Amino acid sequence: MIKFEIGHYTNFKLPSNSTISEQLQETLRTVWDRKYDDLYERGGNSDVEEAFVEVMTAFGMPNDAISHQRYVYMAYGIALAAKPTIKHYFPEEHKADIVQAIVSCWLKDGGEIPETWADTLFPNINKIGKYQATDEAYNIFYGLLQTLNTKTAYNAILDILYDAISGDAISGFAAAQRDMFNWWLIEVIPAAYCLKLPSTLYSGKWDFPPLSQCA
């Protein structure tokens, strides 16, 4: 298995209490052991968006109540990591707080959410952020609402992953993108599979050296 020199998630190690399936574990190992051009890795020749699809296929489609909740927990954990970006630029803005309250209630009480809910709360999603980082962070919260509907949950997760890992929603350091990908693999996925939030939220405040210094 690849061991990374730089980052906070440098070794492939799943939580000791993880109960994910053997197929999913094997998929996580496989995608961990690749290098991705999209994530600014030297020698990378793999496509991270294809890895997202590969992992989510092994994770399972949201076709039943438990599988659907797993999607929501995954999206929720990523959204919480992106929330500080919104609060940094717009400390008085409360849409992220509203979404968080809605999701918390949904996880407690369940129920199907209309497909239009996300558009109702974010009618101008393409204009709301003003900066790339906040645009992408708001997109993640928009996607989080979309995961509450089984018809839109799968595509919403793929969009969330793209904005979170290959964008600036969580961290503005290009060198952090692979580390965020690793965090998703070994922290977010096992937790979501067990209907939990990750034990650690990725932080954009974690420092990284310039990309030119990363091998």
Q: PLM features: what roles do these ranges have?
A:
Residues 2-214:
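Structured binding/interaction patches within domain cores
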